[in-house]
């Protein structure tokens, strides 16, 4: 599955009138690496894969689950919503 994290639209207000588009891939890689306790070497491998990759990376369902879990535990609701949408709309290659 491809998850588009390099052009992630994050809505800054509840009415969704203000947003920012950011490259979140490396930011999420750092979160997994520094705060992904419990994922062990799989988390480390995913963080390295994300850091060195691009929007064309294929993620397994297990990797998507790690991304979702770490983001939900460590970031703001607006960021969580954006990442969950990217995962849900990911494409199978």
Which role fits each region the language model picked out?
Residues 1-93:
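Positively charged, low-complexity terminal tracts
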């Amino acid at each position: 599955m491809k998850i588009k994290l390099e052009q992630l639209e994050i809505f800054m207000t509840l009415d969704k009138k203000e947003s920012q588009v950011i490259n979140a891939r490396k930011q999420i890689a750092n979160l997994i690496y520094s705060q992904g306790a419990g994922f062990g070497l799989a988390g480390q491998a995913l963080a390295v894969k994300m850091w060195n990759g691009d929007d064309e990376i294929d993620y397994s369902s297990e990797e998507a689950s790690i991304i979702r879990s770490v983001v939900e535990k460590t970031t703001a609701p607006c960021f969580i919503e954006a990442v969950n949408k990217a995962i849900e709309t990911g494409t199978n290659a």
